[in-house]
Amino acid sequence: MEDGYGINLVPLASFAIETYANDPCQCFRVHAQEDSDLREVSLNMKMHKAIAIIQFKLEGQVIKRRPEFNMDKRLLLDKIDYEEGTIMIEGKKYELLDKSFPTIDPNNPYELSEAEEALMNRLCMNFLNCDKLQEHIRFLFNKGGLYLCYNSNLLYHGCVPLDEKGNFRKVKIGSKQYSGKELYDVLEYYARKGYYEQDNREEHCLLYTSDAADEGL
């Protein structure tokens, strides 16, 4: 991000160093060259953990606001016993590999800390004010799409929801259900509406579109 778009990640680095100073963050290892500077690798792991925890919190807030997304299984921070260092999933208790969560309030695990809130405000401003990044995003929306028929081939983003028999599975969005091409059309409609109109509901649908692709809906 810094080399390609000139986006300042120093605020994230500073936050990570201060918050996880004595945490090796081994569970958040990132791909690195064999000859990489160990100090840089260590910093990258701290930054990875810092932004990952923030991501889990913000995703949780959206899921709680939009129960129709049916993504409650992604709500994990409230399933953790922070004193024991365990998590309860589908009635079974598992020990966590990483037990250090200094920014999580066990009574309100999806709320950003003041420092996290300030960090995200700065990062959002940096991303929104990056002319080069915004130019590339506009290009993607102007020229791209969720699917394309090209050279007798169907190219599509993410994955197509299917049922056990291999037929298109219906997915509920709003008050209606969609499947196959119709599903992709409505997701693209909301993605474009969210980008061009900057409406909060469609903005959250952009996150849903991304998560849905990851989950296979």
Residue ranges with predicted function:
Residues 216-217:
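N-terminal low-complexity segments that are often proline-rich with Ser/Thr-Pro
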Residues 1-212:
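Feature recognizes metal-dependent phosphohydrolase scaffolds
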